[in-house]
Amino acid sequence: MTIDEQFEKLENTVREYNPGADFKRIRESYEFAKQHHGEQRRKSGELYITHPLAVAQIVAEELHLDSESIEAALLHDVIEDTDATYDDVAKLTSPTVADLVEGVSKLTRIQYATKEDEQMENLRKMLIAMSKDIRVILIKISDRLHNMRTMEYQTPAKQKQKSLETMEIYAPIAHRLGMQRMKWELEDLSLKYLDPIGYDEIVSKLDAKRPEYDALMSRTQAQIDQRLNEMGIKHIVYGRMKHPYSIYRKMFSQNKSLDEIFDLFAFRVVVDTVSDCYNVLGVIHDLYKPILGRFKDYIGTPKPNGYQSLHTTVMGNEGIPFEVQIRTTEMHEIAEYGVAAHWKYKQNGQGAGTEGRYEWVRRLLENQEGADAELLAEETDLFGHDRILAFGEEAVEGLSAFRGEFFGVDSLFAQPRGVSLRDQRQEFRHCLPDRVDRSLVVEVEREERRIL
């Protein structure tokens, strides 16, 4: 596909969800970026303009953002990597778009740090940028996602560094913004480079199980469809395999091998109204035996990032457990796209009350005293388990840390929540199949680390 064909694809994507977009300015932004990036090349050998085109495609296809966001995505590297200036961009488009481009450029300049205080300052800068215009971080996360998708062209050291940074900064922020689809892909791509052996084992085993599970999901979906149709409930049912990092984390939290984990797939039922959600829950519990302690009502008590759904885990008729998530169409869009969906509703005049769902940003910015500990707690809570996976040199107290020099797959360890690894000995079982039990010794004074 030529670069002009890529741009035509972008135009068609935008036209599908926003036929009133300013296509003249979008094309002018593309031509400006193409001219200024000129013969610049990526590590893959492709013309550099393919990258902003891909980022704009993500912004449009995944997030359905407005014309200004598309323009800014196309131009997001011109101030940083060419001789174009803020004034040039403002004259071409508008001061608002120039502000977005400058905001993304500022985030690009943030250097990855291994010291906790430096890392917290970097996170705070990102939060400050978010508080000014949420579109800055949405474009930046899209930028990082495309870079992770093309990470195979980087050196092994760069792959690990960027994957650590993605796992520590971008995936958690995507989670806090409710952008689950992008969070999952960021996590999976990071895991691919942080633990390539573990990632490949999970993917290969999932591929081997896929025909069996596809058939099982098809039968189960037919059962749910039939019963809901009989009840006269308008609905859509989606079935999916769980993503690799979710399974990887479950293996550690439950101290199991992949062969010992059975709930590898889940269903979503999307309906029109909240009352339908609870009616569907009753139908599901009538069809399948619910597993005690596995029901959560996130409709009555939404998550801090605005996520709403009913969650239940049931035992299937064939003896295999699976999760069912039940939500309305609007809840589904917010669950998939997070703050991007909220922002779109706000633009359409439907956003009353959504600002409060992101009060955590302002709260952290306004209350600097103690904010570090609060943000650390927010990060830790992302994992929702009593054990934390760490991929790096040390795990600071209370933080799900992925920092420091990454020194190979055997450096992967699990730590109990709130425990420092300084002068500690942690016994753990590497949960991937056919691996032996190991212990990690950290000797801080002599800066020696041994994997036994």
Which role does the model predict for each range below?
Residues 1-20, 34-40, 49-62, 66, ...:
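Nucleic-acid processing machinery
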Residues 76-81, 85-103, 179:
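Hydrophobic or amphipathic alpha-helical targeting/insertion segments
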Residues 139-142:
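Hydrophobic transmembrane helix module of multi-pass membrane transport proteins
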Residues 447-451:
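Short, intrinsically disordered C-terminal tails of secreted or membrane-associated proteins
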